[in-house]
From Swiss-Prot:
Keywords in alphabetical order: Activator, Nucleus, Transcription, Transcription regulation
Location(s), subcellular: Nucleus
Taxonomic superkingdom: Eukaryota
Disordered: annotated span: 1-92, 120-142
Protein name per Swiss-Prot or TrEMBL: Mediator of RNA polymerase II transcription subunit 30
Taxonomy of the source species: Eukaryota, Metazoa, Ecdysozoa, Arthropoda, Hexapoda
Family statement drawn from the similarity comment of this UniProt entry: Belongs to the Mediator complex subunit 30 family.
Organism of derivation: Drosophila melanogaster
One GO molecular-function entry: transcription coregulator activity
Keyword Nucleus among record annotations: yes
Primary role: Component of the Mediator complex, a coactivator involved in the regulated transcription of nearly all RNA polymerase II-dependent genes. Mediator functions as a bridge to convey information from gene-specific regulatory proteins to the basal RNA polymerase II transcription machinery. Mediator is recruited to promoters by direct interactions with regulatory proteins and serves as a scaffold for the assembly of a functional preinitiation complex with RNA polymerase II and the general transcription factors.
Compositionally biased region (Gly residues): 14-33
Gene that produces this protein: MED30
Amino acid sequence: MWKYGQNQGNQGPSSGGGGGGGPNMMPMGGFGMQHGNMQQMHMSPQHQQQQQQMGMMGGPGSMQMNPQGPGGPGGLMPGMSPQHQMQQQQQQQMMQQQMMVPQQGVGVGVGMGGGVGMGGGGVVPQQQQQQPQQNMPQQNIPQQQQQLNPVAGIPPGGAGGSNNMLAISQQNPHKEINIVQLSRLGQETVQDIASRFQEVFASLKGIQPTSHRENSSEKKVQEYFRTIRLLFKRVRIIYEKCNDAGMDYMSAESLIPYRDEPEPRIEPSLCDEYRKVLQENHELIETVKLKNRQLREIIDRTRIIIWEINTMLAMRRS
């Protein structure tokens, strides 16, 4: 770009119709380049990229304004007097100096435009060019933020969205309750309660029995007790959920069989027909027992009779 400005400055005198525009504005371009380079040394890489983009936009804009004046540097009208042309050039130089002082990064673009050469007709387009250059940093800032957000992996409002997702996942009522997880949570809560009590004892041990009590220590102990109360409530809720989700409590002694104690018999459920049949069975059993008793008596009497008959036969023979 610097060589291009030098070539355009050197071509200024050769063109007919006024040769003072290009060479006079060339030092301004050089000053703009030096001023912009000195300021870029103290800037971050992002600001330097923005300045380079703005300079590239400023350069072509000024290059397009050169063809306005035929036969000479851009903006010099052929029918104007030399004094009027010199006044226009001085006005342009003053405006360029004013633009270079407040806008540090615009010096590169202005220097390039001066190197190419701008005439009196380029004052209004130069102001129009200044407005998009001022709007460029405002447009680049959201673009850089959009580029940084995907790299970081956190969209705008990402923290709030993750917290909402956690709250929804914790408050999901359709999720199955796992007794093992509840038991583990209850165990951690009990350990937390024990650690809180240790902190309470340590804080109470550090308090000295003086007439003036410190409000900070009292507030600290009260905060500990409030936290312990909440932890006990949590343990109670976990205990109720475990009992509701688990099976009924059975003592260990009832599950261990002992040899000395008789095994309990499980009575089946009895219906009416079964009861009737069972009653008939009992009656038949009683009847059979009675018949057996009677048969036994008959057998005993028959045996006695046989013994008596045998005795009588033996006595007759003798």
